[in-house]
Amino acid sequence: MSQSQTDSKAEQKRLNPLTDEELMLEFQNGSNGAFTLLMRRYKDQVVNYAYRFLGNYDDAVDVGQEVFVRVYKYKNNFGHTIKFTTWLYTITANLSKTELKRYWRRNSVSLEQSGNPDSDDHAWDIPDNDYLPDERADQSEIAKRVQIALMKVSPTNRELIVLRDLQDCSYEQIAEITSLELGTVKSRINRGRKQLQEHLRDIYNDYFQIFTKQDDGK
């Protein structure tokens, strides 16, 4: 083993026990190994957030890559008064919303025709053939249908549901990420959950009707 490999392993061993915030301080002080470790810790979570919000895996991967480009480029913008994950998800949420607007521009749908993307009542339906990539085709039917239903929830409420129920962020952290009042966060999450339940009910009613017809031989 070369000296550089030995040094690299020693550096990794030193960094592994550190918190996210401690790793950011190391990164700000010149440790690229700290950045690599942060990326390993959160790459999948960032892509998962973007996928759940956008409904398209390829776009989610692109967002994930850009998130860590921003983390690298703007590392000195991170202040140690907040959690690293709050800063990270703020970047992820903003880039995901930007990508959603790009999606509609690519599909020749103006924001004026589509309605206000920040409206609680406006749900943007991504085509169903985009909701699951080929490499994830082995996911359960339930997981697929939950994602379809999630994409029918209005973007503002969907963002909060993903942060709370899928990314396990606290209400206080979500308020920081979205710059919303705590009471607004809680009410929108409740509203979004109700929307999700309604869409799941609609999907499963159709699903069971199909199988009833098949069982009847029709």
Question: How should each PLM-predicted stretch be described?
Answer:
Residues L18, Q147-T184:
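Helix-turn-helix DNA-binding module
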Residues M39-Y57, Y74, L150, D202:
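Amphipathic, Lys/Arg- and hydrophobic-enriched alpha-helical face
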Residues Q28-N29, N56, F68-K83, R102-Y103:
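Sigma70-family region 2
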Residues Q28-L37, V47-E66, L182, Y207-F208:
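Short, charged helix-capping/linker segments at alpha-helix termini
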Residues N48, D62-V69, I82-N94:
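Structural recognition of an alpha-helix C-terminal capping motif at a helix-to-coil junction
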Residues M1-T6, S108-E112, W124, R145-I148, ...:
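C-terminal edge and immediately downstream basic/flexible tail or linker adjoining helix-turn-helix-like DNA-binding
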Residues N76-H80, T90-L111, R191:
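Arg/Lys-rich amphipathic alpha helix in sigma70-family domain 2
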Residues K9-A10, R14, L18, D118-I148:
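Acidic, proline/glycine-rich intrinsically disordered inter-domain spacer in sigma factors
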